[in-house]
């Protein structure tokens, strides 16, 4: 008997009503491992090192697929090594950036939920607000650069890494908002929104995971955007100063004078209007199975050991209803993940494949009992939610956590990327790096 729910998208989104922001768009990014492999095969990092800091640079845009485990860092590295075996310099800088993702995952592994709070004392004494100003939430700050970044975030679910740092610096330092609020906004809208890279990068900008806070000036934005926004800007630019002047302005006292009147009336982002989520139907009768695979949203690949080694097990993906009600995703994020589920299920031989909505522990427990399953398989990941779900399931079932190969082995506490890179570069590159040290910029 085959039980496959991969073609029930409309019903799924009805059940997810209230768990997402916005609605369907004609040009959202397609998800799934098939699309990830297509993008990887088409990518040439030859000019990456030279253009990566420009917002029109030749970046890979593989990060959404890496974040959801549709591709692995090792697969990307090995593919490029094989494709360009005699041109190591071609991808050295790109591999360094892959290592940032590996580094941030190690940060999450080490700190867990601690990554949600300041990892270090702030390097300044400026107070921060827990409210995002309304003009920011509406993408109407009056600054063409910031509004352009917000338009890309809200409508496209993508921001170039340099633009992410600019916006984070703007929100934290020029508007005086806690980094956690910005990290939450990015998680909701970015296709690659996650805990590790996202929260650690925001802390790097704030200066709670770096030796000093990051900020930019007008020249920096202008130079790396080809004056895309500056040419049309008619307002007094808050970034138009040299770095010493901005440093004094931002960190010698309160940043409140740079906040608009809208900020005084701002509401927390979690007060955004939401619909009520309908409870899912009871799970229908299923063919018995002793093994159940829980596919979480960071392990969506048919090459993942967890599914590859268990072709006869039942497979389930659970949309985490409590988490999505607390922090709804943009519609395009859910559509991307749904694409990933469809693509995964089409490429798995397993006969029972389900997509469910609810509390993962409750739904997996109910499903396991329906199947008569005694063993639940999970792919390893440092996300605390994955770890905690596995721990709760162990109270009732045999849980097998399948190990995930990582790009590097680095036992020490991951405090600074520069120290990490000195130790792991040869693991990533296969040789000692030839280029100078790079900053996370």
Protein language model annotation of sequence segments:
Residues 150-182, 186:
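Conserved catalytic-core segments centered on acid/base and nucleophilic motifs
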Residues 118-135:
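Active-site-proximal, glycine-rich beta->alpha crossover segments in alpha/beta enzymes
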Residues 103:
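Active-site-adjacent helix/loop patches that line small-molecule binding or acyl-intermediate pockets
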Residues 73, 91, 142, 159, ...:
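Hydrophobic (often cysteine-bearing) scaffold residues that line and stabilize catalytic clefts
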Residues 190-258:
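C-terminal, helix-dominated tail/subdomain
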Residues 1-96, 100, 110-123, 151-155, ...:
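Trp/Phe/Arg-rich N-terminal binding region typifying the photolyase-homology
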